């Protein structure tokens, strides 16, 4: 299907530096992130969610962490050093740290003295549990320090990574160094134990690599960047030892240890481990300019997106390994799609955008954010999904908490740090990646520039960007034009729109058309800007039918519905208690309408289409026309258990129904 031409053309004066051309030891990425701390979210869709995470979700995480489960109690025991018993799972420390990180972001967005006091209380307990040599892990302190660093699967470095991330976030928000000093001492212990002695170590659950790069940036100590690079280089060299490597159902593929990182070209194993690994590798490449990492990351990312990603941006189809199986194995009702994996896909895709300046990475980031990740958090803010299937016969429900509780604090920290993903910058250009009502002030080499976005996205495709440089000055403004607005739902060919849309995006500056075309997924406006200039972007949002490639057997003769960045589903609560009996023949048109009374306010889709029923005795099948309603996928399972499906049959033979 041909792509509609955009109503603007690219200005030829703009350019970007290719990461592939950057020499080693030269910063590789053309873009730098704009921190969430520089972005004030004033968005009708996201601001209530940030507030709810602060008011509801983080208090839930606190209560579960220190009252309903023994996580904080383990730190208290470790500090007493009286030989008490460890309670819970050996990686539980990480949930404390992720909750602290979410608290740090929340304090920046919504200052709360009581929350800050609680964070300081936890930090005191964490610091008291640290060993004199810098080691910090309550499981081994309480079960025997003689066994530390003996099983690479036991998440010691994973927990350390989340400690470091929390420490950096809390320091950046409050300026308080106590937790950062704890993290530095632990990182120094790890560096002295492994890299400086060249003692082999392969992380069984990657995370420390990306965390060390954050520590490097906040301390400006290249010791931590070298350690991150060293950990990456340990993989694929036969060093792995412990439960993962001894288990024939796992093995080195499970934790991406079969091939050295720079030689990896295909996605394997546990999805969250992979996302954290590749995020860390991209972070290292951004500093060192290591072309080997850049090429590996590009290839593996394309393998994920082209052959192993759900239309929701969810990844990791198999519950057996919480990860990837074989190409195009994307079942719907059995889909695993861990919330943390979608969160990790947001992290990694952002880093790839910064490395390359290509908008396709933000297209996938946006898809994962609005669909696969956001689905993990209930509309009430106090219930969660661990896995995110694309169909349900009624067996799926959100949970208050989990034994392995990585997802609640992970989605919390992502939502609270949303501002990290909205903008980026280069020396003389500003990049608008996400359409979120917000204000930011960004320094360029010619001076500071304030940008203000106003929009009702994702419900409407109109975005107004007001530009206010501190003085009249030339620079380039690059506004992402999403692939879904150009007849490409995702990069590659795994999904395509099954219908045509003649509507094209338009871009105006001060009410006048701009002669520009997209470049690398962006519309480039290169001009001398003055205070009060207004950029108006219109992204048409027709309801689109998505078809999957023939290789995805689960979705043959089915279509999914998408409007803007949102994937839709049909759920029992809107459709007479059923969702599996719907047929969407070719040519059926859906009408969008905003419903303030539905699911906190959503654009719902409606159409009259056939539904199938089977008589009680199973002797007859009836097809009758009925008005059906589809809702955004992220909003399902907020009204009790029941049927749901994303991929809707085009023919009666594909319908799954039960006798009435």
Regions found by a protein language model. Give the residues of each.
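Bacterial N-terminal signal peptides
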Residues: 7-18
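Bacterial Sec-dependent signal peptides at the C-terminal "C-region" and cleavage site
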Residues: 17-27
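Aromatic (Trp/Tyr) and acidic
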Residues: 25-113, 117, 147-173, 206-223, ...
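Carboxylate/His-rich catalytic cores and anion/metal-binding grooves
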Residues: 115-135, 226-233, 292-309
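Asp-box/WD-like beta-propeller blade repeats and closely related beta-sheet repeat scaffolds
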Residues: 141-157, 164-167, 177-203, 209
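Solenoidal tandem-repeat scaffolds enriched in leucines and small polar residues
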Residues: 189, 199, 204-206, 210-245
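C-terminal beta-rich recognition modules with glycine/proline-rich loops and embedded aromatic residues
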Residues: 228, 297, 363-371, 376-466, ...
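Flexible glycine/proline-rich, aromatic-decorated loop/lid segments
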Residues: 249-254, 308-327
């Amino acid at each position: 299907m041909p792509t509609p031409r955009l109503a603007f053309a690219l200005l030829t004066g703009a350019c970007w530096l290719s990461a592939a051309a950057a020499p080693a030891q030269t910063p590789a990425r053309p873009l730098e992130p704009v921190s969430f701390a520089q972005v004030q979210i004033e968005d009708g869709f996201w601001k209530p969610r940030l507030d709810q995470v602060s008011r509801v979700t983080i208090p839930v995480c606190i209560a579960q962490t220190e009252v309903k489960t023994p996580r904080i109690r383990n730190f208290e025991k470790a500090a007493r050093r009286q030989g008490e018993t460890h309670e819970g799972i050996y990686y539980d420390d990480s949930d404390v740290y992720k909750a602290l990180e979410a608290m740090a972001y929340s304090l920046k967005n919504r200052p709360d003295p009581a929350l800050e006091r609680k964070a300081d209380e936890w930090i005191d307990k964490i610091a008291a549990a640290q060993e004199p040599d810098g080691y910090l892990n309550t499981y081994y302190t309480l079960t025997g320090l003689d066994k530390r660093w003996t099983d690479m699967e036991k998440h010691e470095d994973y927990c350390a990574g989340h400690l470091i991330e929390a420490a950096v976030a809390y320091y950046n928000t409050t300026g308080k160094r106590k937790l950062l000093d704890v993290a530095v001492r632990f990182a120094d212990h790890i560096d002295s134990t492994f890299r400086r002695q060249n003692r082999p170590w392969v992380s069984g659950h990657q995370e420390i690599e990306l965390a060390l790069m954050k520590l490097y940036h906040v301390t400006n100590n290249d010791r931590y960047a070298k350690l991150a690079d060293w950990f990456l280089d340990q993989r694929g060299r036969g060093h792995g030892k412990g439960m993962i490597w001894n288990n024939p159902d796992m093995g080195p593929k499970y934790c991406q240890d079969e091939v050295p990182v720079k030689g990896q070209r295909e996605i394997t194993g546990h999805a969250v481990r992979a996302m954290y690994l590749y995020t860390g590798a991209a972070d290292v490449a951004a500093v060192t300019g290591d072309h080997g990492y850049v090429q590996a990351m590009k290839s593996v990312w394309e393998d994920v997106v082209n052959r192993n990603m759900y239309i929701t941006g969810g990844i990791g189809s198999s519950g057996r390994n919480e990860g990837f199986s074989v190409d195009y194995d994307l079942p719907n009702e059995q889909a695993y799609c861990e919330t943390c994996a979608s969160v990790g896909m947001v992290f990694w895709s952002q880093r790839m955008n910064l490395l390359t300046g290509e908008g396709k990475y933000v297209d996938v980031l946006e898809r994962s954010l609005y669909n696969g990740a956001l689905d993990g958090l209930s509309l009430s803010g106090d219930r969660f999904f661990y896995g995110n299937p694309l169909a349900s016969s009624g067996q799926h429900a959100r949970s208050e908490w989990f034994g392995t509780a990585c997802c609640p604090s992970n989605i919390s920290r992502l939502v609270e740090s949303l501002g990290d993903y909205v903008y980026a910058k280069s020396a003389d250009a500003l990049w608008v990646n996400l359409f979120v009502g917000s204000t930011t002030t960004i320094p360029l080499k010619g001076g500071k520039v304030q940008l203000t976005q106003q929009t009702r996205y994702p419900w409407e495709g109109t975005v107004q960007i007001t530009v206010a440089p501190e003085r009249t000055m030339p620079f380039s403004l690059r506004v992402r034009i999403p692939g879904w607005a150009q007849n490409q739902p995702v990069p590659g060919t795994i999904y395509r729109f099954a219908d045509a849309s003649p509507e094209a995006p338009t871009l105006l500056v001060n009410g006048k058309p701009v002669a520009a075309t997209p470049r690398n997924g962006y519309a480039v406006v290169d001009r001398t800007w003055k205070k009060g200039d207004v950029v108006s972007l219109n992204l048409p949002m027709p309801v689109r039918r998505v078809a999957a490639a023939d290789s995805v057997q689960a979705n043959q003769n089915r279509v999914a519905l998408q409007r803007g960045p949102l994937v839709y589903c049909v759920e029992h609560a809107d459709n007479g208690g059923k969702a599996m009996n719907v047929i969407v023949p070719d040519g059926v048109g859906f009408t969008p309408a905003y419903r303030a009374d539905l699911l906190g306010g959503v654009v719902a889709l409606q159409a009259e289409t056939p539904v199938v029923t089977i008589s009680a005795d199973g002797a007859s099948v009836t097809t009758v026309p009925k008005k059906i309603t589809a809702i955004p996928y992220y909003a399902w399972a907020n009204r009790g258990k029941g049927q749901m499906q994303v991929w809707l049959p085009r023919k009666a033979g594909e319908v799954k129904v039960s006798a009435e």
